[in-house]
Amino acid sequence: VGSEMCIRDRDRKVYDGAAYFLEAADWLLCKLTGKQIRSASFALCKGLWREKQGYPEAGLFAEIAPELENIPEQKLGAKNALYIYPWEKAGTLTEEAAEELKLCADTIVTGAQMDAHAGLPALGITDAGKVLLVVGTSTGIIFQGKSRKEIQGLCSIADYCDLPELIGYAAGQASTGDCLEWFIKNSVPGYCQEQAREAGKDIFSWLSEQAEKLKPGQNGLLALDWWNGNRSCLADQELSGLILGLGLETRPEEIYRALLEACAFGVKRIFKEVEQYGIPLKEIHACGGITQKNPLFMQIYADVTGKKIIVHRCEQAPALGMAIYAAAALPSVKGGYGSGAEEGPQTEAVRHAALSAASANMQSRDFEVYTPQEEYHRVYESMGEEFDRLYDYFGMENHVMKKLKQRQW
């Protein structure tokens, strides 16, 4: 809904001329099946849709702008669409799609799923208590709960958006790899680049090697990971990054390690906020490009959070996850893990059992476990208290970051 409103504000001609707006994934579903299909997961997390209630009452949209009162029917095509979950059959390929993709015409198509969320079954996450940590340019944190808790500052809270019978929660950090890349592009001196070249390494690997020689707290630095604002749990994009403790003796690898630690402290703070609501986060599964390229970073995550980090060497976790969703939708009589009844209503328990079975048999099994180092964890516990003070002070008490951004000439 937010995207449609943005288009309305920026280009009213496009908005008025559009018959309706579709998620790219929903457009693909329509092309593949020839049906008006909508992804229930996308609608839940991005469109304020609910399975039993549908979209919010017209009055909510009318409060934003009178002409938006009937946006679900007028611009989202909600009236005649079928809302399908990723573990449900949406249809089969049309003849044209089957011919173009060189697949059988009876190949089933399931509901679409958001990219990071699709990795859940690929990593064996089909129950509450497990966390999916997707580390890339930014970081996605996806977990499940057995009951609904209204946790402030999360990206989404939606019933059954990821897995049957469970409440899906999503949080995140707006800058992880982007923050590190910014530092390397703008603040790493030439002599570091030269030494990296002489060693036959890229600058990321070289800096990680140098940073690994440092003990926690040895650099005397503490940073906030808000280089692109705070996504969770302050949900404030006007906040900015901070490094405390810089001096004339500070070296590039010390700043680099401080940024790695800041990202880990940010994840721990999110975990802390969530666990206060009674949602246990016991098992951390990580994937994404950085997780396989930077062992130091993964060890810092473990040392800071005090939790084991299970890093999966699965380069296409979302693709594998969608294959698992499809296998759960396919009846066992046809080689899948679903119930014998291809059509007709099924309980959420039956769907959950099918998805769990598919995941157990098809999930990634190539992984490495990073275990917290007790000595380092004790130091990070103390540093974490100072991180929380900075977090609370600059995030909620002192608005100097926003004031600096607002000052214009």
Over which residues does each language-model region extend?
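Glycine/Thr-rich phosphate-binding loops that ligate phosphate moieties of nucleotide
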Residues: 4, 12-13, 22, 35, ...
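Short loop-beta-helix segment that forms the pyridoxal 5′-phosphate
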Residues: 16-18, 22, 80-81, 101-112
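Short beta-strand scaffold segments in enzyme catalytic cores
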Residues: 118-122, 139-143, 223
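Single conserved hydrophobic/aromatic residue that forms the stacking wall/gate
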Residues: 1-7
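Conserved phosphate-binding catalytic cores of ATP/NTP-utilizing and phosphoryl-transfer enzymes
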Residues: 94-103, 113-130
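Accessory "access/gating" subregions that flank catalytic or transport cores
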Residues: 74-77, 81-90, 107-110, 122
